[in-house]
A protein has these predicted regions:
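Mature extracytoplasmic enzyme cores
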Residues: 37-49, 135, 139-147, 151, ...
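Serine-hydrolase-like catalytic core of hydrolytic proteins
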Residues: 75, 83-95
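A glycine-rich phosphate-binding loop feature that marks nucleotide/adenosyl-phosphate handling sites
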Residues: 113, 161-169, 319-326
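Active-site core of glycosidic bond-cleaving carbohydrate-active enzymes
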Residues: 1-21, 46, 53, 57-75, ...
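Beta-sheet entry/capping signal
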Residues: 12, 25-28, 86, 93, ...
Length: 402
């Protein structure tokens, strides 16, 4: 979505909708039924025919739903939200309504879950909690968007969703050495300083989620930084790509850039390896786990986009993680939530020019610490009034197609 290729996202979204709710006796629904639960869920590996295998990965149903919501957030297509995204999100919520249980602290937790790909199975693992939080939060936003245009939603469902969300453990807490805890109980396990495991499962809330941000909570963002520092900069190809995006979300462009260079280091190994030193790319720029895994290519591209433009906190942040190596430059065609397409130029690290194309005619809210926006004009050169929200955050009206 951020690279302005939503048509490349749609086949995956349609696949999710068909397999999750379009087949009454589909394999994804049968997994949930086998557990005595409503809704659907999946395992780690899934093919184009809906076959799911290797290991149960229940929270991945919530992860899939983040894609469904993201497409709406970028396109504002209410028919898509009503007919494709929301039915899947609602079904997924019902799965978790049935599965969550109350912990001794009174919070709702996902029982017997894993932190991919290490450690014990236990209740309230950060990976599961953060994804269920994201699911419930985005489904509530979907309900709000549909109700604004008088689309009727089951009130019993909405009430239960709000109640479960209020009681849910959000999966984000700080541990004994200042890290985001990977497991609910801080007993050491594998959650020790210096563990350089390739996965960042406890940082789903940083990226691709939006629960951790310096715009929200400095303490939690600092803890995410401690966690990333502990994991180190090495990793499989896709792991390095994930770290690029995470450092971009923490507004550290120089660190993200170092990881980008690392992700582009030459790899020659073509057999399966979990050695963190073997990741990179092959001579044809295919990502090397090793062997080839395309998520590293997609992830690195997404990370670069995150360095230049972010919109995950309800406003658009221009040049949030610009590295010193890119002090002068330009970019065209990147897209944000709210259906805005941006062209930007900068010099010596400061924004010098910015144009915005509004795809839906919504109000545009921008945060630009890398350059003061003193004047906004429409395509005819007429000045548009700016509202100053707070702390460098501005808002102005837009017209669809301009």
């Amino acid at each position: 979505e951020i690279t302005n290729l939503p048509e490349c996202h749609l086949p995956f979204l349609q696949y999710i909708a068909v397999e999750a709710v379009g087949k009454p006796n589909g394999s994804w629904r049968r997994i949930a039924q086998g557990e005595g639960l409503r809704g659907w869920t999946i395992k780690t590996q899934n093919n184009i025919f809906g076959y799911s295998d290797w290991n149960i990965n229940r929270p991945a149903n919530a992860w899939y739903c983040t894609h469904l919501w993201q497409h709406y957030a970028y396109n504002n297509d209410l028919e898509y939200l009503r007919n494709i995204a929301f039915p899947v999100m609602q079904s997924t919520c019902k799965y978790w309504f049935d599965r969550l249980k109350e912990n001794k602290d009174g919070k709702l937790v996902a029982p017997d879950e894993w932190s991919p790909e290490q450690g014990p199975w236990e209740d309230g693992v950060a990976y599961a909690q953060q994804l269920v939080w994201q699911l419930f939060n985005e489904t509530l936003h979907a309900v709000e968007a549909l109700k604004k245009v008088d689309i009727q939603i089951d009130n019993v469902f909405v009430s239960e969703l709000a109640d479960k969300f209020r009681k849910l453990d959000n999966g984000v807490s700080v541990g004994s050495w200042g890290q985001i805890k990977e497991w609910k109980e801080d007993k050491g396990k594998l959650d020790f300083q210096g563990n350089d495991h390739r996965h960042l499962s406890q940082l789903i809330a940083l990226y691709p989620g939006n629960q951790i941000s310096y715009h929200r909570d400095t303490l939690l963002a600092d803890a995410a930084k401690v966690t990333l520092q502990s994991r180190g900069d090495m990793g499989t190809g896709w792991s390095r790509a994930w770290k690029i995006a995470c450092w971009a979300r923490l507004f550290d462009g120089d660190h993200a850039y170092r990881l980008l260079k690392s992700a582009l280091s030459l790899s020659t190994l073509t057999v399966i390896s979990m050695d963190n030193s073997k990741g990179g790319v092959y001579e044809n720029l295919f990502d090397s786990h090793p062997p080839f895994q395309i998520d590293g290519n997609f992830g690195a591209t997404a990370g670069i986009a995150e360095m230049l433009l972010q919109s995950n906190q309800g406003f658009i942040h221009l040049l949030p993680a610009l590295p010193l190596a890119w002090s002068d430059g330009s970019v065209a065609g990147l897209r944000t939530e709210g259906d805005f397409t941006f062209t930007m130029k900068w010099n010596a690290g400061w924004l010098t020019q910015c144009s915005v194309l509004s795809g839906s005619g919504l109000k545009c809210r921008i945060y630009s610490p890398k350059g003061l926006i003193a004047r906004v004009e429409n395509s005819s050169g007429k000045r548009i009034p700016i509202s100053l929200i707070k702390g460098g955050l501005i808002e102005f009206p837009t017209k669809k197609g301009e």
